[in-house]
């Protein structure tokens, strides 16, 4: 044994740097504790990409850090995990960079299941057999909560993260903190009292939250008293304990488990952008339907225009009129839609100061009604315009000179193609053209007195 380690290391008068002190302390520890066996329970196990393992070995009264390097880790047969009771062998050393006292291990043997893990599995099996985890017991979360109770520590990042999520997504929701300790033996009774108090205050939903930590740090959420308080809660409750990889008994009993406290807030924070997205979707659908219908009618009109050669100018005017109505209808539709979007934006701006949950259903119903009425109104307008167009087309066909020829009349034309309206425009022997409904005749004037003209067909 070393009777005077300071004398041996030359520390009686020498002034050392921190690095020198840590280096000599490491040498001293490794010289005295070259190989020791220690039994305890693993916690805070870490496996970096290097293949080394780092964890804390603890018992009920103390803990020590351990390092198991890759060449020795490959020889460990037992899969290591938090809560596992093990017996380890190694040398006592010092990590000089931080001045941390630690064990450098060469052997790890199982010493039976960890007490905490055994207690966890036993309680999980017991409560599961009672049906406390069944899906039939789970209560649905409210779609648009107005008041939410948050059961967590009043300090730390958890409450700030939850407030931040609600401030960003749903600032109109009222948040109420029910403070409690979230670690240690005294936290168990506090959490139970906080759950019962929150359940009696008429909140729309509750969040039971805590940040990450070791199995021991989170253990109060694995206690039977806390689990039964969660199960007895009438208000829908979300359990958000630890990180995504952490699982607690309260997660199984709660109505919904969230991987993190921020995720729990997102589950309960209604997204006000959803209504705007729905309106934009309806706008796109209505515009597409309107464009398809107008394109179909325009193509049909163009087809009719090509088939009706007379009177072409009137048809072109009607087509232009229809295009004008089309553009006016589009402008009116866009004006109406923009007005409704502006009104929705104003309502959205008031959400932060008011509670819009009561009016949200009414606004959705009104929006659905408008979405159903607008295509029907458009079809009625197009139908009326089409009927008026057909009526005017029939009127044009009645007064057309071609209709007169079809009833048996003819038109006399002179050599220059001018219409003959009086006998005075002709002379005896003059050759004329008689245009009929179908074909033409070449005729000659026999007598051009003011009495009816006598015509004869030319040989």
From Swiss-Prot:
<dbReference type="InterPro" id="IPR020579">
    <property type="entry name" value="Exonuc_VII_lsu_C"/>
</dbReference>
<dbReference type="GO" id="GO:0006308">
    <property type="term" value="P:DNA catabolic process"/>
</dbReference>
<dbReference type="GO" id="GO:0009318">
    <property type="term" value="C:exodeoxyribonuclease VII complex"/>
</dbReference>
<dbReference type="InterPro" id="IPR003753">
    <property type="entry name" value="Exonuc_VII_L"/>
</dbReference>
<comment type="subunit">
    <text>Heterooligomer composed of large and small subunits.</text>
</comment>
<dbReference type="Pfam" id="PF02601">
    <property type="entry name" value="Exonuc_VII_L"/>
</dbReference>
<dbReference type="GO" id="GO:0003676">
    <property type="term" value="F:nucleic acid binding"/>
</dbReference>
<comment type="function">
    <text>Bidirectionally degrades single-stranded DNA into large acid-insoluble oligonucleotides, which are then degraded further into small acid-soluble oligonucleotides.</text>
</comment>
<comment type="similarity">
    <text>Belongs to the XseA family.</text>
</comment>
<protein>
    <recommendedName>
        <fullName>Exodeoxyribonuclease 7 large subunit</fullName>
        <ecNumber>3.1.11.6</ecNumber>
    </recommendedName>
</protein>
<keyword id="KW-0540">Nuclease</keyword>
<dbReference type="InterPro" id="IPR025824">
    <property type="entry name" value="OB-fold_nuc-bd_dom"/>
</dbReference>
<dbReference type="GO" id="GO:0008855">
    <property type="term" value="F:exodeoxyribonuclease VII activity"/>
</dbReference>
<keyword id="KW-0269">Exonuclease</keyword>
<keyword id="KW-0378">Hydrolase</keyword>
<dbReference type="Pfam" id="PF13742">
    <property type="entry name" value="tRNA_anti_2"/>
</dbReference>
<keyword id="KW-0963">Cytoplasm</keyword>
<dbReference type="GO" id="GO:0005737">
    <property type="term" value="C:cytoplasm"/>
</dbReference>
């Amino acid at each position: 044994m070393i009777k005077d380690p300071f004398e041996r290391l030359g520390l009686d008068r020498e002034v050392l740097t921190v690095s020198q002190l840590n280096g000599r302390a490491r040498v001293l520890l490794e010289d005295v504790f070259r190989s020791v066996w220690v039994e305890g329970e693993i916690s805070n196990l870490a496996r970096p990409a290097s293949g080394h393992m780092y964890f804390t070995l603890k018992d009920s009264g103390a803990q020590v850090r351990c390092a198991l390097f890759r060449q020795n880790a490959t020889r460990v047969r037992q899969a290591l995990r938090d809560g596992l009771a093990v017996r380890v062998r190694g040398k006592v050393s010092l990590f000089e960079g931080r001045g941390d006292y630690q064990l450098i291990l060469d052997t790890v043997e199982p010493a039976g299941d960890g007490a905490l893990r055994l207690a966890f599995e036993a309680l999980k099996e017991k409560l599961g057999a009672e049906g406390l985890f069944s899906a039939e017991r789970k209560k649905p979360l409210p779609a648009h909560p107005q008041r939410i109770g948050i059961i967590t520590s009043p300090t730390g990042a958890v409450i700030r993260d939850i407030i931040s999520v609600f401030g960003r997504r749903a600032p109109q929701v009222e948040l109420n903190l029910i403070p409690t300790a979230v670690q240690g033996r005294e936290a168990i009774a506090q959490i139970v009292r906080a759950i019962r108090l929150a359940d009696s205050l008429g909140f729309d939903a509750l969040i039971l939250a805590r940040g990450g930590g070791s199995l021991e740090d989170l253990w109060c959420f694995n206690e039977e008293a806390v689990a039964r308080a969660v199960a007895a809660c009438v208000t829908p409750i979300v359990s958000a304990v630890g990180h995504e990889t952490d699982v607690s008994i309260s997660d199984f009993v709660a109505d919904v488990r969230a991987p993190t406290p921020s995720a729990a807030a997102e589950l309960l924070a209604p997204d006000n952008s959803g209504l705007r997205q729905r309106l934009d979707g309806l706008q796109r659908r209505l515009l597409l339907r309107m464009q398809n219908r107008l394109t179909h009618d325009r193509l049909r009109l163009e087809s009719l225009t090509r088939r009706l050669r007379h009177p072409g100018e009137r048809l072109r005017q009607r087509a232009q009129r229809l295009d004008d109505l089309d553009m006016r209808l589009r402008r009116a539709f866009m004006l109406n839609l923009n007005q409704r979007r502006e009104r929705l934006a104003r309502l959205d701006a008031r959400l932060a100061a008011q509670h819009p949950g009561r009016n949200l259903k009414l606004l959705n119903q009104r929006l659905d009604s408008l979405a159903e009425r607008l295509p029907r109104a458009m079809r009625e307008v197009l139908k009326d315009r089409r009927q008026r167009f057909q009526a005017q087309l029939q009127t044009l066909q009645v007064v057309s000179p071609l209709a007169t020829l079809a009833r048996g009349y003819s038109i006399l034309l002179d050599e220059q193609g001018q219409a003959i309206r009086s006998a005075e425009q002709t002379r005896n022997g003059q050759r004329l053209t008689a245009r009929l409904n179908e074909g033409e005749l070449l005729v000659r004037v026999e007598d051009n007195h003011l009495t009816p003209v006598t015509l004869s067909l030319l040989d």
